[in-house]
C-alpha cells in the first residue's frame, strides 16, 4: 500500500483525496494546507491525519506519495522539499512559474531519479481518447480549441500563472497530442481583446492564439474568462471530408459544467496509471508545454 498526502485543499483539490481512496494500492494518510480550517475540515471529512508542520509529514518515511494540488505559486517550494526527501510526486501543472528555474528543477528531479507525474489529465478524458482514436488513420489539417469560462477573478488568475499558464496549458498539450507534433510558429493576440482590469495586472482576460505545427497542422485557440454560459470547452478536428466535434462526446447536461465535472473521470485515470508505473509519467510533456506557454506569452506582449 502506497501511503499518501495531498497538499492543497481547495474544492477541486479534494478530488485527489477521494481518488486515493478508490485506487487499490494507495491510501490517503495525510492532508496539508497552510489554512488551518481547510486542513482540519479535510482531515475530518476524509478520516486521515494532518499537521500544522509540513516538515513533520515530510520526515515520515511511511508517506511515499505526495500530490501537489496547491496554488501554482507554491509548486516550486513543495517540489524542492519533496525532491530533497526523495518522495514520489504527482504535481498539477505547471511545474514552476519561474522559467529560469525550470531547468534546474528538472535536472534535480532526473539526477535524483524522482518518480514524478505532471497532471496532464485531459489526455485521459474519455471524450478526447475517443476523438484521438477516430483520427488514427486520418490526416488532420486544422484543430480549433475553445476554452471560455465565467471566472473573471484577476487575483486567482495571476496566482495560477495567468491566462496561458492557467487556462491554456492543458489545451496546448492536447494540441500536441492530437497533432503528434510540436508548434514551429506562434502568433498571439491578447492586448486589444482583454479588459483593463486584467491588463493592469499584467495578465489577459481574452486571447486568440494561432500556431503552425511542424507537420503543417494549423491550430487556433480562443480563450476567455468572460463567458456568461459557464465553462465552455470545445475541440474540433478538421480534415478532408471530415469534422470531429467534442460536443458529440459529452452529455448535453454537462457541456457547460466546470472541468472537475466534465472531466472527472480523467483525474482518477491519470493518477491510477501513474501509481502503477515504475517510472515517471508526462514529465517531458509538462516541460514542453510550459515552454510553449512562455512562447505564447512572449508573442502576446509584442502583438
Each predicted region: which residue ranges?
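N-terminal Rossmann-like dinucleotide-binding module
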Residues: 1-45
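C-terminal helix-rich "cap/oligomerization" subdomain common to oxidoreductases
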Residues: 7, 65-70, 214, 272-303
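Beta-loop-alpha module in the N-terminal Rossmann-like domain of NAD(P)-dependent dehydrogenases
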Residues: 16, 46-108
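Conserved acidic residues
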Residues: 29, 62-64, 141
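Hydrophobic residues in well-ordered beta-strands that form the structural core
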Residues: 52, 91, 116-118, 246
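A contiguous active-site-proximal alpha/beta segment in oxidoreductase catalytic domains
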Residues: 73, 96-154
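Rossmann-like dinucleotide-binding domain that binds NAD(P)(H)
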Residues: 154-218, 224-229, 284
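NAD(P)-dinucleotide binding in Rossmann-like oxidoreductases
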Residues: 199-204, 215-272, 282
Amino acid at each position: 500500500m502506497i501511503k499518501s498526502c495531498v497538499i492543497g485543499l481547495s474544492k477541486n483539490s479534494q478530488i485527489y483525496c477521494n481518488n486515493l481512496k478508490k485506487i487499490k494500492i494507495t491510501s490517503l494518510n495525510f492532508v496539508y494546507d497552510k489554512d488551518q480550517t481547510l486542513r482540519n475540515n479535510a482531515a475530518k471529512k476524509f478520516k486521515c491525519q494532518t499537521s500544522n508542520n509540513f516538515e513533520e509529514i515530510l520526515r515520515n518515511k511511511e508517506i511515499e506519495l505526495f500530490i501537489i494540488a496547491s496554488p501554482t505559486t507554491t509548486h516550486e517550494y513543495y517540489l524542492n522539499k519533496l525532491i530533497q526527501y526523495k518522495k514520489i510526486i504527482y504535481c498539477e501543472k505547471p511545474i514552476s512559474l519561474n522559467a529560469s528555474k525550470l531547468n534546474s528543477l528538472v535536472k534535480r528531479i532526473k539526477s535524483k531519479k524522482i518518480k514524478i507525474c505532471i497532471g496532464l489529465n485531459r489526455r485521459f478524458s474519455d471524450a478526447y481518447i475517443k476523438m484521438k482514436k477516430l483520427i488514427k488513420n486520418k490526416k488532420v489539417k486544422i484543430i480549433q480549441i475553445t476554452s471560455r469560462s465565467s471566472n473573471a477573478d484577476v487575483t486567482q488568475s495571476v496566482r495560477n500563472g495567468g491566462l496561458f499558464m492557467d487556462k491554456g496549458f492543458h489545451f496546448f498539450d492536447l494540441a500536441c497530442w492530437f497533432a503528434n507534433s510540436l508548434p514551429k510558429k506562434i502568433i498571439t493576440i491578447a492586448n486589444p481583446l482583454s479588459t483593463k482590469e486584467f491588463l493592469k495586472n499584467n495578465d489577459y482576460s481574452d486571447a486568440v492564439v494561432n500556431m503552425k505545427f511542424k507537420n503543417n497542422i494549423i491550430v487556433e485557440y480562443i480563450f476567455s474568462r468572460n463567458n456568461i454560459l459557464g465553462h465552455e470547452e470545445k475541440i474540433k478536428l478538421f480534415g478532408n471530408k471530415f469534422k470531429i466535434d467534442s460536443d458529440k462526446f459529452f452529455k448535453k447536461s454537462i457541456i457547460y459544467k466546470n472541468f472537475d465535472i466534465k472531466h472527472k473521470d480523467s483525474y482518477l485515470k491519470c493518477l491510477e496509471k501513474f501509481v502503477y508505473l515504475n517510472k515517471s509519467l508526462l514529465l517531458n510533456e509538462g516541460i514542453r508545454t510550459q515552454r510553449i506557454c512562455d512562447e505564447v506569452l512572449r508573442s502576446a506582449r509584442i502583438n
